[in-house]
Curated annotation (Swiss-Prot):
Disulfide bonds join C106-C204. Residues 154-156, 310-311 are annotated as: Interaction with tRNA. One of its GO terms (cellular component) is cytoplasm. Keywords: ATP-binding, Cytoplasm, Disulfide bond, Nucleotide-binding, RNA-binding, Transferase, tRNA processing, tRNA-binding. The record marks H131, Q343 as: Interaction with tRNA. InterPro entries: MnmA-like (IPR004506), MnmA-like_C (IPR046885), MnmA-like_central (IPR046884), MnmA-like_central_sf (IPR023382), Rossmann-like_a/b/a_fold (IPR014729). It comes from Thermoanaerobacter pseudethanolicus (strain ATCC 33223 / 39E) (Clostridium thermohydrosulfuricum). This is tRNA-specific 2-thiouridylase MnmA 2.
Amino acid sequence: MEINNRVAIGMSGGVDSSVAAYLLKKQGFDVIGLTMRVWVDHEAKAFDSDKSCCSLKATQDAKKVAEILGIPHYTVDLSKIFYDKIVNYFVNEYLKGRTPNPCVLCNRQIKFGELLEKAFELGAYYIATGHYVRKEYDEKTKRYLLKKGIDSSKDQSYVLYRLTQKQLEHALFPLGNYKKEEIRALAEELKLPVAKKPESQEICFIPDNDYSGLIKRQVKDEIKPGEFRDVHGKFLGYHKGIIHYTIGQRRGLGLSSDRPLYVVDIDVKNNVVVVGHQEDVWGEELISSNNNFISIEKLEKEMKVTAKIRYTAKEEEAIIKPYEEDKVLVKFLKPQRAITPGQSVVFYDKDVVVGGGIIERKLK
């Protein structure tokens, strides 16, 4: 496909993507607005919440903004493929005792996968989003780089670490050099109807934030009560089913103890939730699998990086090195709290994303 100036922007009906669309138009791009229709749990209590990025109101808001900006707008029904690839993954990970981040998978497979294909069909060379990240091309390595947004409080590079070189080639991130308050101020200046809209905090397909409720509705009979045991194997009581627990969790265990108890492991095979004290929750080493690298083609030798083990975590110094098959051994210089299988660990070299992978297990 020849490079052209047509760009399709994913519009969620929120402030960020709305202003991103305006900025692209101002820069001279031929802009098309696309809003994804994804599968949403209709039985969730807050299904029609205006805060949800998947509500009918959100789609109407996106259309309104597109009209104001004078750009065409289309709704793309991706509900079936979203359910098959994202919702099923989310549910199955919890059934395996893991805690997934569905946004990471959605960005690679849906937003920069299915939606990018739709952009191509509409004659666009680029797909854009309202993520707070930057993209650069490194002439030396001939690779596209993903860099943190300049607003450190809003940087979203963690959820985009799985993007491929082809996806990055076609990606535009208009907000990477802005701070959030500048974007909201611009929305107000433009008198966009979404200027004061609050940010969506929940996972888009679970508007009431009730993960276990969603999972129960999908799998029904597969969730069985089991035993709580301590780190020495001593029986402490019964749990409601492993989907209700994640590593580091303290609330909702229903166990009495002279010291606070935390989930430290989930033994799926035996349907046991292992609990321990605060010191049992910390670890320094982990194995990541299903890794994706951006600034380098492949990890071939030991490398010093900073890394974080969840979206809200602080980056910490670590050493990464190749492990058996295509896995990576990550050794942090300081202990990390609640290394959680299923979450992503993302590696950085200053403000550049080196890559990352899915946490398979804590080593020690």
